[in-house]
C-alpha cells in the first residue's frame, strides 16, 4: 500500500521516520516550524542540521512549506514535534484536518501546561480522528542508516494500530502493536527523566552497580505510575518501557543521558543544555511527571530526586545519600 504522508517536525527523529516511510515506498513531505530550516531542506534536499550522515533525501521525500494549504493531499499525518509543541500542532490540525485523515504521534512526554497524556490532548481536540503512538528503543541516526530497529505502535483501535504497523515495517524496522496506549506513553515519557538520572550518576562515577539499580528501580516507578493510570502490567517489560529505558539510560547517543552526564561532571543546567545543543525532553518532562505523580498520589523517589536537582538546585550527592538511607522496605 502506497500512501501520502505528512510529517510535522523535522528534528532528527521526525526526519528518520520520514526516511523510513520513504524507504517503505510512501510519498512523504516533511515540515519544520522554522522557515529557514524548511528553506535549507528544500534547497539542499537533506537535513544536515539534524542528520548529517544522510547526504540526500530519497526521491519520495521532500520538504514542504505551506502544509495547511496542501492538507488534502495526505492520507496520514505524523506528528514528531517536541512535547512542548504537540498541543499547538494538534490545534493547528483541527483547523484543516479532513474526516478521512488520521494521526500518528512520535512525540514522547506529557503536555507541558496541563500535565495530561498526549493522547488525551489529541482525543480532546480531535475526538473523531484515529490516533496512534509510535514509541520504543530507537535512536534516530541508527534508524536513518537502516540499522535493525524494533518499536511499538499503540492505539485504542487495534485495526488502526495494524494499519500503522504495515505503513512502517520492513526488513530493517519491525513494529509490534498494542492497545495499551497509556502504558506505552508513560514508559516513553518517564524514561527520559530517568536517563538524566543515569547520566548524572555516570558523570559522578557512581559505577555500574548504581546504574543497574537505577534502571531497575526506575522501571518500578514507571510501572507504579502506569498501573495507577490503568495501564497493563505486561507493557512495562516490553519495548515501549524496558527496552526504551535500557537504551536511553545506557548510551550517550541519548541527549537526556548526555545532559545528565554534564551535570554530574559539574556543569550548570544552562551550560549542559548549551553543550547538548538540542531539545532535552527529560528536562521539561521532569516537571510534568513530578506534578502528574503528585496529582495522582504516586511516590516516585528517583523522579522526585531528579526534579529536585533540576528545579530546586539540590546537590546530587545529598540526594543520593537521602535515597540510600530512606526507610527500608520490601522490594515489591
Swiss-Prot record:
Family assignment from sequence similarity: Belongs to the NAD-dependent glycerol-3-phosphate dehydrogenase family.
InterPro entries: 6-PGluconate_DH-like_C_sf, 6PGD_dom2, G3P_DH_NAD-dep, G3P_DH_NAD-dep_C, G3P_DH_NAD-dep_N, NAD(P)-bd_dom_sf
GO process terms (BP): carbohydrate metabolic process; glycerol-3-phosphate biosynthetic process; glycerol-3-phosphate catabolic process; glycerophospholipid biosynthetic process
Keyword Ribosomal protein among record annotations: no
UniProt-listed PANTHER family: GLYCEROL-3-PHOSPHATE DEHYDROGENASE, GLYCEROL-3-PHOSPHATE DEHYDROGENASE [NAD(+)] 2, CHLOROPLASTIC
Binding site for NADPH: 13, 34, 108, 140, 255, 279, 281
Chief site of localization: cytoplasm
NCBIfam families on file: PRK00094.1-2, PRK00094.1-4
Catalytic activity: sn-glycerol 3-phosphate + NAD(+) = dihydroxyacetone phosphate + NADH + H(+); sn-glycerol 3-phosphate + NADP(+) = dihydroxyacetone phosphate + NADPH + H(+)
Subcellular location: Cytoplasm
GO cellular component: cytosol
UniProt keyword Transferase, yes or no: no
Role this protein plays: Catalyzes the reduction of the glycolytic intermediate dihydroxyacetone phosphate (DHAP) to sn-glycerol 3-phosphate (G3P), the key precursor for phospholipid synthesis.
Record protein name field: Glycerol-3-phosphate dehydrogenase [NAD(P)+]
Assigned EC number: 1.1.1.94
GO molecular function: glycerol-3-phosphate dehydrogenase [NAD(P)+] activity; NAD binding
Pfam families for this protein: NAD_Gly3P_dh_C, NAD_Gly3P_dh_N
Keywords assigned by UniProt, alphabetized: Cytoplasm, Lipid biosynthesis, Lipid metabolism, NAD, NADP, Nucleotide-binding, Oxidoreductase, Phospholipid biosynthesis, Phospholipid metabolism
Positions annotated to bind sn-glycerol 3-phosphate: 108, 136, 138, 191, 244, 254-256
Pathway per the UniProt entry: Membrane lipid metabolism; glycerophospholipid metabolism
Catalytic residue list: 191
